[in-house]
């Protein structure tokens, strides 16, 4: 009866991987069984934040862009590409995202993906980080 009512109401049952009451093993197995190979490989991709990418794209010379891997410039890649990959679930994390607005924007993109896997947002900071206004580093 419940299944019929759910079908009539147009509601879908929550996938196991989104059910917090299911065990971690059940959730992981369910999610992996739903993922395509492209999505699994995509979940190993980490990019720099879009604003970091834009800033380096305009502040570096052509030679620096071609030879400097420390600033994480991706030759031939556009912001549109990065947004599209995120919408398709082909990015798992971003580094150098400095504002909550950008972090929220990126998370909204990831929630448009088929499986809605949230992103990890990080910063590459060995000795602490004070990139956000008002932070204290100990």
Regions inferred by a protein language model and the residue ranges of each:
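N-terminal beta-rich core of secreted/periplasmic extracellular enzymes
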Residues: 10-138
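Bacterial Sec-dependent N-terminal signal peptides
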Residues: 1-13
């Amino acid at each position: 009866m419940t299944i019929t009512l759910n079908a009539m109401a147009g509601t879908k049952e929550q996938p196991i991987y989104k059910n917090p009451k299911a065990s971690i093993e059940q959730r992981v197995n369910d999610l992996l069984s739903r993922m395509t190979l492209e999505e699994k490989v995509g979940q190993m991709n980490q990019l720099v934040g879009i604003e970091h990418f834009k800033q380096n794209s305009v502040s570096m010379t052509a030679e620096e862009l071609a030879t400097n891997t420390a600033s994480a410039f991706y030759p031939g890649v556009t912001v549109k590409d990065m947004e599209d990959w995120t919408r398709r679930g082909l990015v798992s994390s971003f580094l150098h995202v400095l504002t909550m607005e950008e972090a929220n924007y990126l998370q909204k993109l990831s929630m448009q993906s088929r499986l809605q896997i949230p992103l990890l947002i990080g910063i590459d900071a060995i000795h602490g980080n004070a990139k956000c206004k008002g932070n204290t580093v100990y």
